[in-house]
Amino acid sequence: MTEGRCAQHPDGLDVQDVCDPDDPRLDDFRDLNSIDRRPDLPTGKALVIAEGVLVVQRMLASRFTPLALFGTDRRLAELKDDLAGVGAPYYRASADVMARVIGFHLNRGVLAAARRVPEPSVAQVVAGARTVAVLEGVNDHENLGSIFRNAAGLSVDAVVFGTGCADPLYRRAVRVSMGHALLVPYARAADWPTELMTLKESGFRLLAMTPHGNACKLPEAIAAVSHERIALLVGAEGPGLTAAALRISDVRVRIPMSRGTDSLNVATAAALAFYERTRSGHHIGPGT
């Protein structure tokens, strides 16, 4: 490779070869594990990072426009058809150079960086929606990413964040979601839990998930509202939904459990609720 020169890739991509890990063109990808890469912190860089071919493809299909791509020869070649017309530079480097830039070895071999874009309101993301996931206190990025992946695969139309939730665009959340955090519409409630009342006034039935023994069993509760617009409320692992959220909900629902187990991982519980919704007749469309 010749450092800093543009080269014609055998598959037709115009790439810029980089051999120096200190090259300032790669600053958007530098030290990805550093605390200042946390975009949810006051001093954090507010960039969205996609890792791996599939997640980069989903970024390219989303509202997030890449500033640059950085990858190995092999992985950039896999993206050849997706990159037509993308007005961003492609930086090519060895796996060794990539590791020195980002701070760890990346098996997936390619990254894309994008700026954040303005977020829609709750009213905008739920307009026309039939099934909405409402999260409160879900502060683990991996759980959040898994919920987005489950939502995408099980026909959830939008996600609404209440208080105390993690950042859906943090790198780990985007990676675990397989890029679906970039595609599934979401919004943050400006006034919590008052926004739950707004959902009710918009015609949604609020089903609050809780392990309490006096709650309705999930399959029966979902079946009873199969023709209605529903919002599935999911709380933090451990404390669950707050008393205020439970009070506003229309129905409290629980997953029937066995062997003395009182609850499941929050992403697993959400997936079961989403699946019950599809099983009750809510349409599963073609995958992304």
Swiss-Prot record:
<dbReference type="InterPro" id="IPR029026">
    <property type="entry name" value="tRNA_m1G_MTases_N"/>
</dbReference>
<dbReference type="InterPro" id="IPR001537">
    <property type="entry name" value="SpoU_MeTrfase"/>
</dbReference>
<dbReference type="GO" id="GO:0006396">
    <property type="term" value="P:RNA processing"/>
</dbReference>
<dbReference type="InterPro" id="IPR029028">
    <property type="entry name" value="Alpha/beta_knot_MTases"/>
</dbReference>
<keyword id="KW-0489">Methyltransferase</keyword>
<comment type="similarity">
    <text>Belongs to the class IV-like SAM-binding methyltransferase superfamily. RNA methyltransferase TrmH family.</text>
</comment>
<dbReference type="GO" id="GO:0032259">
    <property type="term" value="P:methylation"/>
</dbReference>
<protein>
    <recommendedName>
        <fullName>Uncharacterized tRNA/rRNA methyltransferase Mb0905</fullName>
        <ecNumber>2.1.1.-</ecNumber>
    </recommendedName>
</protein>
<keyword id="KW-0808">Transferase</keyword>
<dbReference type="GO" id="GO:0008173">
    <property type="term" value="F:RNA methyltransferase activity"/>
</dbReference>
<feature type="compositionally biased region" description="Basic and acidic residues">
    <location>
        <begin position="1"/>
        <end position="12"/>
    </location>
</feature>
<feature type="region of interest" description="Disordered">
    <location>
        <begin position="1"/>
        <end position="20"/>
    </location>
</feature>
<dbReference type="InterPro" id="IPR029064">
    <property type="entry name" value="Ribosomal_eL30-like_sf"/>
</dbReference>
<dbReference type="InterPro" id="IPR051259">
    <property type="entry name" value="rRNA_Methyltransferase"/>
</dbReference>
<dbReference type="GO" id="GO:0003723">
    <property type="term" value="F:RNA binding"/>
</dbReference>
<dbReference type="Pfam" id="PF00588">
    <property type="entry name" value="SpoU_methylase"/>
</dbReference>
